């Protein structure tokens, strides 16, 4: 006998790097657990219409612009669930209208919350390791496994081993050889790998879903239109100014790399943001911002003081 199926619209509401979370009552399915806002898609509703309605009814705010995030299928013992996920940033003017008991949590705090099993893949996508190693040499991916590990994250039961290790951005212009090399990686290494969209689009679909994130250069970001980001995979934008940072927000990116913060040997002639300008940009972001340029792994606390979520580096990582 087949299980009943339920289609649910789920909203990931973002503000200054935090995510809105609520609590499921004991009498609800999967009760006494945390939840993201949302609810059942009614007959005649599209998923995004249901998302918009549920957020107005449950949270108390009306948001029109939503970005498709993913569709997740999960089977419980008694029911088959399809989660249609969307994400949106919340304007500061709406904060006072948000109804209790909805609460803002940092990405790190999400790891310690008790969510239904169907939400675990959402948590893994929302949480980013705080370090990104950048290299043109893919062989460094394996050597970099234990060089920088978020010690706190390793203690979290909801975080798998790969997520607890630094991410690795394979930066290369050699597309053909890059595609061949990436296809030789195992799933563990793919789960830490960030590659540019030009490489990613040439991979088989199974490998496209396995990578940690898809990278877009600033010009690629500026050339995109709303709705063109791929579904079901994290996307990270390279930004060098406020215009591109704001563009990344409007397009629905998951995170950004903001650079250069300090002078670097690889880009000696580039205009450096400096910490104060970086802080101004990062503090205005609702997405995780990685600081890049002249930083070492030990600079994480400094970068976070100026509004960064994490740091990225080349020669010093």
Where do the protein language model's features map onto the residues?
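Glycine-rich phosphate-binding active-site loops on the catalytic face of alpha/beta enzymes
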Residues: 218-224, 257-269, 295-317
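Conserved Nudix-box catalytic region and its N-terminal flanking loop in Nudix hydrolases
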Residues: 18-58, 192-194
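Catalytic beta/alpha-barrel core
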Residues: 134-137, 146-158, 163-246, 257-259
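Active-site-adjacent beta-strand/loop module that shapes the phosphate/pyrophosphate-binding cleft
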Residues: 72-96
């Amino acid at each position: 006998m087949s299980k009943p199926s339920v289609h649910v619209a789920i909203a990931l509401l973002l503000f200054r790097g935090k995510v809105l979370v609520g609590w499921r009552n004991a009498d609800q399915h999967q009760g006494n657990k945390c939840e993201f806002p949302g609810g059942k898609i009614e007959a005649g509703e599209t998923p995004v219409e249901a998302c918009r309605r549920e957020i107005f009814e449950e949270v108390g705010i009306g948001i029109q612009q939503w970005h498709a995030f993913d569709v997740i299928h999960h089977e419980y013992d008694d029911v088959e669930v399809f989660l249609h996920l969307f994400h949106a940033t919340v304007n500061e003017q709406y904060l006072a209208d948000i109804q209790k008991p909805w609460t803002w949590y940092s990405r790190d705090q999400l790891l310690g919350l008790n969510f239904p099993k169907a939400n675990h893949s959402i948590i893994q996508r929302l949480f980013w390791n705080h370090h990104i190693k950048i290299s043109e040499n893919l062989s460094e991916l394996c050597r970099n496994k234990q060089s920088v590990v978020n010690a706190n994250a390793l203690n979290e039961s909801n975080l798998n081993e790969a997520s607890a290790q630094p991410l690795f951005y394979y930066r290369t212009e050699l597309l053909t050889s890059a595609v061949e090399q990436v296809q030789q990686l195992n799933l563990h290494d793919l789960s830490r790998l960030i590659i540019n969209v030009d490489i990613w689009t040439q991979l088989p679909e199974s490998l496209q879903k396995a990578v940690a994130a898809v990278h877009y250069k600033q010009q690629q970001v500026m050339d995109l239109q709303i709705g063109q980001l791929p579904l079901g995979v994290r996307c990270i934008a390279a930004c060098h100014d406020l215009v591109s940072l704001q563009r990344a927000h409007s397009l629905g990116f998951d995170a950004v790399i903001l650079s250069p913060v300090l002078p670097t040997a690889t880009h000696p002639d580039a205009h450096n943001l400096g910490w104060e300008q970086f802080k101004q940009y990062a503090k205005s972001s609702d997405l995780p911002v990685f600081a890049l340029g002249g930083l070492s792994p030990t600079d994480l606390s400094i970068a976070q003081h100026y509004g960064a979520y994490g740091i990225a580096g080349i020669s010093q990582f």
